[in-house]
From Swiss-Prot:
Subunit structure: The virion is composed of 60 copies each of the F, G, and J proteins, and 12 copies of the H protein. There are 12 spikes which are each composed of 5 G and one H proteins.
GO cellular component: viral capsid
Miscellaneous information on this protein: Phi KhT, a host-range mutant of phi K, can grow on E.coli C and B, besides K12, and is more thermosensitive than the parental phage phi K.
Alphabetized UniProt keyword annotations: Capsid protein, Host-virus interaction, Viral attachment to host cell, Viral genome ejection through host cell envelope, Viral penetration into host cytoplasm, Virion, Virus entry into host cell
Protein name: Major spike protein G
Membership in a protein family: Belongs to the microvirus G protein family.
Source species: Enterobacteria phage phiK
Any one biological process term the GO annotation gives: symbiont-mediated perturbation of host process
Disulfide linkage: none
Consequence the record notes for mutating residue 75 to S: In phi KhT mutant
Amino acid sequence: MYQIFVTKHDTAIQTSRFSVTGSITPVAPTGNIPVINTGNITAEHAVVSLYANLTAGTSSDGSFIVAMKVDTSPADPNCVISAGVNLSFAGTSYPIVGIVRFESASDQPTSIAGSQIEHYPIEMSVGSGGVCSARDCVTVDIHPRAFGNNVFVGVICSSAKWTSGRVLGTIATTQVIREYQVLQPLK
């Protein structure tokens, strides 16, 4: 009753279009994607409350990323990244939410090229009125592939039908360095 299981550990996809059904039309971002951060991006966990006015000019192909710097000290290169998203969008834009990994020489990147991200799909639900929520975990390589780079993971929101307006909600990401075993109560 108290135990939550990790649903999937997906591998990164790099496609020009994500496969989805229904009226949602996602597009893989191509230009520079803005990295939205309120204050500093911290290591190991980030909780960001968004209250932003985004315009079509603010985002690349209707995308933005909320990211955190990864702790690269564990010897094991594979680490679980947990993400929880609950967002409300003004207008009729329904984004696709996923976890991304990218590297940057900067400690506080403000944008990243769409071709340099690795996208990990996560399960999400979309409600009426531009509301979406997602909660899932993925396994990510936390060691830099180029010497001197910092590794960042975060949540990307993409939509081909992006409309200007407010984005409200919370995005939480956590790097799980140690796995804990949850004990079940005896019956």
